């Protein structure tokens, strides 16, 4: 059965109170989740913490938190804090981001994104499960790392932002869900197939993995203005080489 959430853009023109009002309205109207991306000079965790203070039931997710800009331990700390503030309603959405943004904004070489995602999730899952982590990978080495008393009391679901076959298979192998973006209807079946293959390789039940994605809609009385707002979104993402390739296909 389909379930619905909303994405609130991290818009610096909106005040923290604006976010609280919008999220509360979504909750009252039966939406299951509120997702907030990084952007606009604001981090998503701060915005979600603000929302958590004025909501009670709606799930709160990062959509997404870029992994290149944070260490796995730092990300786990943020997730644990949000789990506490939201009373267990937090969903940790992670993504590798895109090379132009990572390199120009964060000043970090965009190298080995698949390896970085895999190791990041392995470390975070262990930390959030209350384990003492001794980890040696290709990119990270942790010794005696632990969340201690800050370990979440409930499980924090981890979603991966994915479109390509390799990342989709990793969703099936390691994650609780996938968060897709600009996924064409005729590609959706193929994408889910990649997730199922990853799950089967890992001995997991594919049906236990949540399939989620952003669908753009424009709400308004002026059809032309609504279409223009969506055209802006398409143009914005089409300027990114990664999405442009998907649009071309």
Where are these regions (language model features)?
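Active-site-adjacent structural elements that line small-molecule/cofactor binding pockets in enzymes
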Residues: 1-249
């Amino acid at each position: 059965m389909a379930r619905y959430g909303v994405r609130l853009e991290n818009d610096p023109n909106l005040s923290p109170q604006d976010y609280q009002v919008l999220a509360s309205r979504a909750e009252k109207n039966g939406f299951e989740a509120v997702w907030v991306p990084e952007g606009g000079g604001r981090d998503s965790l701060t915005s979600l913490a603000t929302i958590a203070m004025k909501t009670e039931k709606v799930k709160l997710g990062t959509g997404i938190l870029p992994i290149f800009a944070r260490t796995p331990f730092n990300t786990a700390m943020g997730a644990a804090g949000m789990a506490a503030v939201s009373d267990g309603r937090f969903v940790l959405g992670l993504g590798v981001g895109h090379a132009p943004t990572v390199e120009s904004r964060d000043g970090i070489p965009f190298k080995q994104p698949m390896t970085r995602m895999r190791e990041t999730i392995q470390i975070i899952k262990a930390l959030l499960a209350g384990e003492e982590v001794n980890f040696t990978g290709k990119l990270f080495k942790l010794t005696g790392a632990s969340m201690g008393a800050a370990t979440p009391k409930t499980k924090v679901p981890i979603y991966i932002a994915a479109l390509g076959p390799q990342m989709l298979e990793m969703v099936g192998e390691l994650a609780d869900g996938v968060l897709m973006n600009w996924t064409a209807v005729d590609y959706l079946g193929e994408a889910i197939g990649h997730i199922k293959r990853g799950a089967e390789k890992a001995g997991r039940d594919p049906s236990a993995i949540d399939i989620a994605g952003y669908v753009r809609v424009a709400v308004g009385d002026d059809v032309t203005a609504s279409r223009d707002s969506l055209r802006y979104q398409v143009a914005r993402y089409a300027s990114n080489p990664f999405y442009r390739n998907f649009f071309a296909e």
